[in-house]
Amino acid sequence: MRSLCVDLGQRSYPIHTGTGILADSALFAPALSKGPVAVVTDSNVAPLYLETLQKTLKALDKPSLSIILPAGEESKSLDNIQEIAGRLLSAGYGRDCTLCALGGGVVGDITGFAAAVYQRGVAYIQVPTTLLAMVDSSVGGKTGVNHPLGKNMIGAFYQPQAVIADTDTLDSLPEREFRSGLAEVIKYGLINDQGFFSWLEDHMDAVLAREPDALTKVIRHSCKDKADIVARDELEGGLRAILNLGHTFGHAIEAATGYGQYLHGEAVAIGMVMAADLSRRLDLIRESEQDRIYALVEATGLPTLAPALPVADYLGFMRVDKKAEGGRVRFILLRGIGSAVITGEVPPAAITQTLQAFMEHGHA
């Protein structure tokens, strides 16, 4: 088992990664408030890991309530925030309770937001069971739900008490979900770490085979990269925005197609190759660098084309992106592999050209 700290002063918390740690009550104990616990999970994860976590909590003499949501992006809704709050109120849970998010990014995001708003804030623990959640969404305190007009438009920055990532849970992760998580892994190499990107190029076969040593490196390296960035810019006032590489295009794809058609990592993968293309059109990166980025995403088995929809549809969703300022879309682009830049100075014609170049079945 390895641990690292997200250094945020009084809001600092540990990230624990290892095998079999879902059953380690000693890791959970320091992160729990004195009151009861509610485990929020989904219909896919509950049959696999809920009983193990319940036994861990029982060993700590913690009464626990289980809230099982339908699996899928559609569960990230205000209706389910009401559902969670209603269950907690009906059970008499007060401000001394702790919520445990057992699942992937959807469960983590909605549980964190529920914790942020229930009785003006209660403690919560992230217990990620997908690669994407382990390397990205469980770390950093971004919580929220979707709105029909945009992804993650209703939410809060609210840090967990701990992240406890049992890598044994990846054994049951479907291949598509596993590859989706690798999009965020590639992102860290692109924005911050050229050496890590090169390592991924050389070792992607081992990662896709889920070889333990390769997986361990991927998870720990990604968590450290994100923890370092979050520690320097918790509320995304500047630097932290680079973590959104591929997300401006990606969120537009998710919203335009209806949440659920694309996994988040799949949309981000398309968004990253689009961002690389836009960077090349603006002479920020060389064509050879764009080719390397495309090749790695493709080698990972992730999609590289968006569905053919009117360009205006995509642009409409991009304008309501949270990074937009004064109605102007801001992009995270690349100045080479391992270096990102935040800019709102992008010619509209270049955005349209990129969208058209990466749409399936012709251009809209």
From Swiss-Prot:
Question: Which parts of the sequence bind NAD(+)?
Answer: G105, V106, V107, G108, D109, T129, T130, K142, K151
Q: Name one GO cellular component term.
A: cytoplasm
* Keywords in alphabetical order: Amino-acid biosynthesis, Aromatic amino acid biosynthesis, Cobalt, Cytoplasm, Lyase, Metal-binding, NAD, Nucleotide-binding, Zinc
Similarity comment text for this entry: Belongs to the sugar phosphate cyclases superfamily. Dehydroquinate synthase family.
Q: What is its EC number?
A: 4.2.3.4
- Coarsely, its chief localization is cytoplasm
What GO annotations for molecular function exist for this entry?
3-dehydroquinate synthase activity; metal ion binding; nucleotide binding
Q: What is the organism lineage in this UniProt record?
A: Bacteria, Pseudomonadati, Pseudomonadota, Acidithiobacillia, Acidithiobacillales
What organism is recorded for this protein?
A: Acidithiobacillus ferrooxidans (strain ATCC 23270 / DSM 14882 / CIP 104768 / NCIMB 8455) (Ferrobacillus ferrooxidans (strain ATCC 23270))
Transmembrane parts of this sequence: none
Q: What is this protein called?
A: 3-dehydroquinate synthase
Answer yes or no on keyword Cell membrane.
no
What's a GO biological-process term for it?
chorismate biosynthetic process
